[in-house]
Every structure is written in C-alpha cells, then in structure tokens.
C-alpha cells in the first residue's frame, strides 16, 4: 500500500530552513514530531449550504426577473445545472447561454436599474427594455477555473435585455457566464489542486483551480489532460496528452470508488508516461492523497494500478525558524529558543536566511554576506552588489532582489545565477519575493506604473532540482498596493502584508489566500509588522511576524488563532 504525507512548508527568509519531513497541508497548527498515526484517506469537505431557488413569478417586473436570475445562478453552479436559472431566459437566450464558460465574483449588494432599449422590440414582443446591474467585481474565473483578481474600487455595469411576450418579462440577451457573490463563492466552487510535474521530474506543483461543485471531478480530469496556464509554461515536464479525452462526459462514483473512463489515447503512452498520468489524476482527485481509490480505464483496459511504482509525492520539506537576535542566531523550532550560532555586527540587518547548513544576512548597506553553519562569515555574495531584499529558496538557495528591483539573483552552493523577468513592465520593480515549498513557484510583490500587487510565476528545475530558469509569463494573484512582505504558509496558502504609511499600524493590511484565489483578511497582532515568515515554532507549523520593537509573535491553532510571543530583541526576520 502506498502512503503519501502532505506537508505544510514554507521558510522564512530571515529565518532558516531546517529540512525535515512533516504531514498536512491545511492551515492548522499541527505537531510535526512524535508518533505517527495511520489515518484513513479523507476527501476535502466544505460546510456547504444548498439553495433551492424559485422560478419567475407571474407578472414579475423586469428588475425582479433579473434579481431572480441572480438568485438562481449559484444553484446552477452548485447542483441543478442551471435548470431554474434558465426559466428566467427566453428560449433562444437559454440556448445560447453557457453558464460554465466564466464567472464574475462580486462583493456587496448589486444595484438593479432599468433603462430604455433604443433598439426596437423584436417581432412578436410586446415591448423591450434593459436592466443594468452595477457591481463591485473583485475577481473572475475563466473556463478552466483559473482565478484572476480585479480592482474592487471600480464598478462594472452588466446589461440584460428583456422582452415582454404574452404578458411576461424574460431575459432575451445576456453574456455567457455566471455572476456569483463572495458569500456564495466557496459554497458553489470547489478548490482543486491540479498536480503538475516540474521539468525536474521530481517535484509536484499544485496548480490551483476553482471548479463547480456539481461536476468538479469531471472538470478536474479534463484539466489534468489540458494545457497548463501560461504562467507555468516552460517549467513543466512535457506530457503529450492532446489525444487523451474522457470517453464519457462524466466521472461517476460507484461503491465509494471514483471511475474514470478514458479513450484509447492513453494506450499510446509508454509505461512511464501512463503511470505518471494516472498518478497525477489520483493526486488531483484525492487532494494530494496517493491512496485515493480510483478505477481508471483506457478503451476498456484497466490502468488503475499503473502508478504503483511512481515515487513522486506531495511531501515538502518544512522550515525551521531562526532569528538574528543580539548577535546570536536563535532557533525557535523547539519549545524553548536555542542558540545555534554567533553572528555579531549585524545590528541593523535588513534580512536574514538560515538553515542547518548556513545562510546569509542582508546588511544595512544592502550587501548580502554569506554565513557558515556556526554563523561565521564566508564572504559576500553577488559580487558585493547591494540588494533590496533576500529570501530562502529550495535546499539552501539564497534569492535576492537587486537594488533597482529589476533583476533576481540566486546563490546555490557557491554558484550564482542572474535572472530577468520578461513580463516585468519597464516602469515596474520588485519589492520582495517568496519561493514556494517545492521551489517551482515565485510570489513577487511588484509596484510600478503597469503592475501593482502580487504576481506569481514559475521556476524551471533541472533533474537534480537546481535552478534552470523562469517562466516567461506571470499571473496576478492580488491587486493590493504597497505589499512589502510575503510568505508561503504552506504549499497552497500565501500570506502577505503592506507597510503602513507614516507608521500608522491601523492602516496596515494583511491578507491570505489560496493562490490564485479569493483573498481573506489576515488578523495581525498590535504594533507595526516589519516582516513575516512561516515554519516550525515550538514543535508546530506557524506563521511568524516581527514588529518594529523586535518582538516575534506566532499564531497558533490556525491562521485565525491567537498570537503569542516567541522571541524578543530580534534584529531581523525575513520572509520567504
């Protein structure tokens, strides 16, 4: 029997990464040491509320018809396949409307207003008008379930043409796609990680999608077989799956076993490729669980055990948290802070990364200085050129942002690599960055004329997991301005925060999200937060912050838990 343990992993940049293996990828404070229990595989569950919308009432006014359509759309995504929603449309409008093609996500309350239709009513219609809906759109989904945030300060107006026939109003013209409130979003869309394989062939990348609850399994298999989004192009292992399709447009569950029937295209794959495909489908359907029960066939041939010898797992290394405190390097991994090295002379350090094999410190003058495992200096990095920020990468890598914010520099075991971002606008610059636990994604805080917010791009790796390049594209995961710190809390969740203007802590914002996905506010402790990171603190996975007084606090239990002091008089705490 194969077993995979998922991990929450993210290293703090002023913190170090002490590699061990741990379980779980949920945002909860779980022990990462002690005895191991074998638990039955479980499927992701959400407290969903099922809606039961009503169809149009006789003699309803145009605004009421459009409001009723809005009330019925969530159930269409979630359960009824738009059966009730289509009752608000004319026959021709219903035939041309595809609710699954896209989604707009809005906050607040829509405003419904009618206006005259300057185009004469079609033949057979008694009259025609337009109801315009004004919304605060915060994000959107494309047909593949990829989320893109929008600037919620800008309103959007959606027109719906209605016609009156036989005394009843119906919507006769509208754009395809659904419009869903933020309150309904996670009730009707399920988060699914479509597991992609990196160019190294040794790392799995969770490609986050949001798929309708009513048929998410069918959609998920389709996405495994489809092309990856552009921001991951060039960082994934070539699959050659274009000829493989679902034999039937459904993925049933029989006797608690998911059944996936593919066409003969899978038969053309070699044994290794076929095993990898089956493994990716298993992990995607099972939320990273390699024991998820599946029956997979290709043109009648059973391939359910084709991945029996595939060793690729969703396991991630965890990060041991270290601080630079009064010239000492301190580990916070155990229940009591422990000195593990001496690094005097960095009282004004701007950043710090460390692991059991050593690390680096970003000095006050912007120069990055190498540190040995005992804290002693091992020279300067990046030819002594000043850097804006540093963070920990994969297996002891040190990533740095150039002083002008236009280039990235990476040091790995003495080898240094310079990287440019093809998608970065001419007037944009990088403020900070974080490397994902598996090392194949970058989250970057960007400010400038063309882009403001948090972007994500892919990292290509060689067979030995060393860096080989970056994707030529990026995707925006947040439009929040003035982000100066960010960290991957685990392989799915990203946490980021702003620096408040003029030291006003009440104006400091922090958010968390499955990236890309909708953002939720992250509660911070009192004071002005200057840096954040995540890793092992007091034997548990936690988010840590340091404030302007040098106090390190960590949140326990969950990201909504209480904040407790972990260390004080801290000089530097970076963010991965």
From Swiss-Prot:
A Pfam entry, by short name: Gmad1
Record's keyword terms, sorted: Cell membrane, Lipoprotein, Membrane, Palmitate, Signal
Lipidation (N-palmitoyl cysteine): 17
GO CC terms in record: plasma membrane
Membrane disposition: Lipid-anchor
Localization terms from the record: Cell membrane
Domain of life from the UniProt record: Bacteria
Leader sequence segment: 1-16
Entry-linked InterPro entries: Lipoprotein_LpqB, Lipoprotein_LpqB_C
Lipidation (S-diacylglycerol cysteine): 17
HAMAP family to which the protein is assigned, alphabetical: LpqB_lipoprot (MF_01373)
Similarity annotation: Belongs to the LpqB lipoprotein family.
Protein name per the record: Lipoprotein LpqB
Organism, as annotated: Bifidobacterium longum (strain NCC 2705)
Originating gene: lpqB
